[in-house]
Design a protein with these regions (language model features):
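Basic, Lys/Arg- and aromatic-enriched nucleic-acid-binding interface segment
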Residues: 124-154
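Short, basic (Lys/Arg/His-rich) helix/loop patches that form interaction surfaces
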Residues: 131-134, 185, 204, 224-263
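N-terminal core-binding DNA-recognition domain of tyrosine recombinases/integrases
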Residues: 5-113, 131-132
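Conserved tyrosine-mediated DNA breakage-rejoining catalytic core shared by Y-recombinases
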Residues: 150, 159-194
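Alpha-helix N-cap/helix-start motif at helix boundaries, enriched for small hydrophobics
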Residues: 85, 143-144, 151, 155-160, ...
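Active-site/catalytic core of tyrosine-dependent DNA strand-transfer enzymes
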Residues: 188-235
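DNA breakage-rejoining catalytic core of tyrosine-based enzymes
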Residues: 109-125, 179-189, 203-206, 220
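Catalytic-site neighborhood detector that most strongly recognizes the C-terminal catalytic loop/helix
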Residues: 116, 176, 265-290
Length: 291
């Protein structure tokens, strides 16, 4: 099985999948094989069978428990595991396709609750990051600014290469987006200024825009630590909070069309973007008083 997993990993890397995707998919497929041998004993694995896929899907839906909550897996988690098997099937057993996207569970889109973080609080957080001690302050400030005002996923931000950003044209190129989709994101002057000032102090040779002192791509653990240290008391700000903030504010501004926001955020469907079109309760309250 090790040889097969090495082949799977190698082919994913060759296809340009991100390190995170490779890690998650490898772990998910290994989990399938653990279930396979637990279920069928010492029977030698030959190939994927449709019957096994359906039984595994039933196991995920009805028996498998979340390691975090102890409850049944949510549809999103099940789909993540099935997506790994779809990829494995396509890359390792391309002549034996027995699982596809049709097997994914349809998820009812939920309205995203309004963010409780205001722009003032985001700006306070950004300033704390900028004023933090250490040579990495400007780097971290640039990262936080991109997350808040371009809406990138943290993985997309940390995967940016220096060649991916063009300050003169106010745009950056995301090449390792979710689903491995590439896109161009237009950025504002806050981001241009933050990145430009960071680059003035960056003396390390590296292909990565955001890197450590050895020139290696920055990892998410480091950024999570920055958020924890700099987040004002009483606030709960994470990288995803900033992406959420961007989406809510882009939608509520009325300046952008939904397809424009979907492109900026890398949503494959505008239905995902429309989840952020929830009503502003304060505005409704004011309108009700006018009746």
């Amino acid at each position: 099985m090790e040889k097969m997993m090495d082949e799977f990993k190698r082919k994913m890397i060759h296809d340009g999948k991100s390190d995170r995707t490779v890690e998650v998919y490898v772990n998910s497929v290994k989990e399938f094989f653990r279930w396979f041998y637990d279920s069928y004993g010492n029977v030698e694995y030959k190939k994927l069978y449709r019957e096994n896929i359906l039984e595994y899907k039933s196991y995920l839906k009805n028996i498998k428990k979340s390691s975090h909550s102890g409850n049944n897996l949510c549809p999103k988690s099940i789909n993540s595991k099935l997506s790994a098997l779809i990829c494995f099937n396509e890359l390792v057993e391309p002549d034996n396709i027995v699982v596809s996207k049709k097997d994914l569970i349809k998820i009812q889109a939920e309205i995203v609750s309004p963010t409780s973080i205001t722009k003032r609080e985001i700006e306070e957080f950004r300033q704390i990051v900028l004023q933090a001690e250490g040579c990495a302050a400007r780097r971290n400030f640039a990262i936080v600014t991109i997350l808040a005002y371009a809406g990138l996923r943290i993985s997309e931000c940390l995967n940016l290469r220096k060649s991916d950003i063009c300050l003169e044209s106010n745009q950056l190129r995301v090449t390792n987006g979710k689903g491995e989709k590439a896109r161009i994101v237009i950025v504002n002057s806050k981001i241009v200024s933050a990145v430009r000032e960071y680059q003035k102090t960056d003396r390390v040779e590296s292909e990565w825009l955001f890197h450590n002192s050895r020139g290696e791509r920055l990892n998410q653990t480091t950024i999570n630590r920055v958020f924890k240290l700099c987040c004002p008391k009483g606030y709960e700000i994470t990288p995803h909070t900033l992406r959420h903030f961007y989406a809510i504010n882009a939608v509520s501004s009325g300046i952008f069309t939904i397809p424009e926001i979907a492109n900026q955020m890398g949503h494959s469907s505008i239905k995902t973007t429309m989840r952020y079109m929830n009503p502003n309760l304060e505005e409704i309250r004011q309108k009700v008083e006018m009746l």
